[in-house]
Amino acid sequence: MADELLHYGEDYHFIPATSAASGGGVSVLPDLYCHTVQIVNICLVGRPDDGAFVLIDAGMPGSADDIISAVEDRFGSGSRPQAIILTHGHFDHVGALIELIREWNVPVYAHKDELPYLTGKTRYPEPDASVEGGLLAKISPFFPNEPIQLGDHVHPLPEDGTVPHLPEFRWLHTPGHTPGHISLFRPHDAALIAGDAFVTVRQDSLYKVLTQQTEITGPPRYYTTDWTAARESVRKLAALFPSVAVTGHGAPVAGEELRDGLTKLARDFDRIAVLDYGKYVH
């Protein structure tokens, strides 16, 4: 597909939301860097002294310049990733994707079940503003929800669980938040890139998002449509006993804080994460 045919949904627009962490980054490991774009995280996987790296997710609408700046600050002027891997296709994870494709001309990979939402075929279910929670949940119907059109720039991840250009990682299907949601895990050091399978900030609360108050909890409530699958995905990740985790929202967590928090979430998922009411709660 020609670049000029790439397009966002008609409802795509800048979201004036931010957090205390916006614009900052954390070197979680020598080859794992977490950068916050307003209220969402991207990851850069690769050592700065090597120059080869992969970008995980693509931030908020209008954030391309911020992401390119973060990349060049870490890897040098003119650097570009070998590929972009998407944990899923919600607007806050693909918001700068088309600009980045045009800037870098690199392939994009996602789970096959996520491709309809990335090729203009299917829109996600409407956010549930009725869920219990804070202001962000209430305004979620105003978030972009029309599908992005990436055409042949996006490819399905290999069925064998390998991750292009990241041979030490494996991708895991962690549905619930979206049908084709994935997380990335590296067995030798138990490093986890969770996406939104679980997060470390209560994403429906504006105050907690603004302050980035750490709390290991389930996926963002207003966008999660399959709570049974979400529960099983958290249990799958907890069973890996990750040593460090970067999630789609909130600060990276590690060690005892991660182990205890994720174990508790897996054990008490319905009490901690699932809603008492909402149109996707059954």
Question: Regions from the language model: what does each represent?
Answer:
Residues 64, 72-155, 264-265, 271-272:
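Active-site HxH/HxHxD metal-binding segment of metal-dependent hydrolases
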Residues 117-121, 202-204, 279-280:
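Short, charged, surface-exposed secondary-structure boundary motifs
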Residues 3-16, 60-62, 114-175, 179-257, 269:
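Metallo-beta-lactamase
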Residues 250-282:
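Binuclear metal-ion centers of metallo-dependent hydrolases, dominated by the metallo-beta-lactamase
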Residues 28, 103-104, 241:
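Short, structured coil segments at secondary-structure junctions
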Residues 18-75, 183-195, 200:
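Conserved beta-strand hairpin/beta-sheet module of binuclear metal-dependent hydrolase folds
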Residues 54-56, 85, 108, 191-193, ...:
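Residue-level marker for buried hydrophobic side chains located in beta-strands
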